[in-house]
């Protein structure tokens, strides 16, 4: 249940980091690497949504998808923080939301790892 909440918060943050939310930089200022980041973000978003859907029926698979999706999202966040995606500076609200998302991603990774370990215990 905690993993589902963390993933839902992450999905909400991803949406807030888009032009549907608080992103104000125009797409015309996006660099080539930024287009790759958009693909990575959508792939991670799809993995998070699939993980939420599968969490209560196939916990092991859901936790693997959550781990992969969370790891994928670190690349666009760090790339944006370094200025690799846009020729304009990061708006303050995006900057703050990305830091919050890093914390949520770390929590998601921890919870997904915990679900994975509990769904497939190692022999003792």
PLM regions and their residue ranges:
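Hydrophobic transmembrane helix segments
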Residues: 1-46, 73-77
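Membrane-interfacial loop-to-transmembrane alpha-helix junctions, especially the N-terminal start
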Residues: 1-7, 59-67
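Hydrophobic residues within alpha-helical transmembrane segments
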Residues: 8, 68-71, 96-99
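Hydrophobic core of alpha-helical transmembrane segments in multi-pass integral membrane proteins
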Residues: 11-15, 49-52, 102-113
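A cytosolic-side transmembrane-helix exit/cap motif
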Residues: 29-30, 82-94
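Hydrophobic alpha-helical membrane segments
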Residues: 43, 63-82, 103-106
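Juxtamembrane helix-break-helix junctions at the cytosolic face
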Residues: 48-64
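Alpha-helical membrane-associated segments of multi-pass integral membrane proteins
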Residues: 88-120
């Amino acid at each position: 249940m905690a993993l589902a909440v963390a993933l839902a918060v992450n999905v909400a943050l991803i949406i807030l980091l888009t032009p549907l939310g608080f992103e104000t930089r125009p797409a015309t200022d996006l660099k080539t690497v930024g287009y790759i980041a958009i693909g990575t973000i959508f792939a991670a978003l799809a993995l998070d949504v699939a993980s939420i859907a599968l969490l209560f029926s196939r916990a092991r698979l859901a936790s693997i998808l959550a781990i992969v999706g969370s790891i994928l999202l670190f690349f666009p966040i760090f790339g944006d923080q370094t200025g690799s995606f846009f020729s304009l500076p990061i708006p303050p609200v995006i900057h703050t939301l990305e830091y919050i998302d890093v914390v949520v991603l770390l929590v998601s990774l921890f919870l997904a790892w915990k679900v994975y370990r509990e769904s497939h215990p190692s022999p003792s």
